[in-house]
């Protein structure tokens, strides 16, 4: 899931107008705000967020210094005949050499500004580009020109609709958008669009249960998140990284206990959990870690661990076959622990039987420190 960032542009108008943009961004989950140097500390008083400032030095203490305003980038100064003579390029280079995180700001007026932006992108950590009239073509060209560089391209937009287009341009899209809008709903919608596009889908398939066996006592892990999950949502858990079961959240009421929709009673301490395109051991998770929440259609979203509970409980072995692959998971033996059935309906492990079909995720290759590698490995 490639993260798409949303920056809020708040460098014009009075402080009260800027403050409204910033607070809406903070409350909605924006990633960064772009302000003038004199407003950096004011932003920090409002909340904890990355602060970028238009400047040519780092006296403001901003997290990111953005070069280009009142320079060549926005057309205040003419573009140089040669890049080595550029006012903005030299300023960005000096800051980069000092270890400062630098953004380059360029307003695309014509092809010459597009070429200038590409040069800034080779120096800066972030390239903030916007247009006098919004067009996709300059963004496509810059993505193509800078695809081998480490720079992140942040494209200037004025609406959530423009943001969606920027995120989806070419295969990769912009890394983020710089939203210039004082409309609170537009800010919320843009951030929502970014988060939805981060939520890639993963392919799930059904496996046939071949064995259900009580094992006795062992240590199991509950993942309590800062997120509320729906029926059919949970996490991918298993004893093999090559194949994991969709374990349902405790989102259903039962005769014995109230629903805890923030929780996935995930499995024994040795188990793998799939997070993004990597795996981790359940037992190494801790508060503040990111996890991947997935539903029965394969749609993913990010969750945050609020607490991990490891307790001794009776365990149960679940074995299933998908094609010629045999998968296993060891879960707590309790009525409230459920796998997700083929049709998206949760099935309690207490009622699970041979022949039932449950949703799983299959992977090829092996894992080395959680990363997928091409290697033959047998896990039983």
UniProtKB/Swiss-Prot annotation:
Catalytic activity: 2-amino-2,3,7-trideoxy-D-lyxo-hept-6-ulosonate + NAD(+) + H2O = 3-dehydroquinate + NH4(+) + NADH + H(+)
Pfam families reported for this sequence: DHQS
Presence of keyword Oxidoreductase: yes
Coiled coil: none
GO molecular function: 3-dehydroquinate synthase activity; dehydroquinate synthase activity; NAD binding
KW Lyase (keyword) present: no
Similarity section: Belongs to the archaeal-type DHQ synthase family.
Protein name: 3-dehydroquinate synthase
